[in-house]
């Protein structure tokens, strides 16, 4: 079982969020110590909270991360809002993050554990996607493939 962070990580309409930061995850994951009680590490959801250090969150819970969504965001100048960006152009340093992920996967492989499943999250709507009759916002085929190719390029470059 994996727990995805609140998306977005801020209260909406006065309804508080459940899990948006290191402290929230620590409370939940420490409440029942099991590899089955894990985290869906969503870089976009976590990075959209300006108080989060996603690299520290990853390092803290790396053994409990069961799935990864790779998405990038940019915090607005007002520090109160954010928007999604292309995978390589936001505030998240994907080279740094992917190095951490690969290091953890290497550790797991020594212990005969599986790789961490991951995927690009929320690809952008590119020209070809705009003419499709039915698209799911954030899940366009070509936009996600572009994100996947960028992420695979980083993996290849740092490996």
Say what each PLM segment does.
Residues 7:
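Helix-loop segments that flank and shape redox-cofactor active sites
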Residues 10-159:
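Histidine-acidic metal/acid-base catalytic patches
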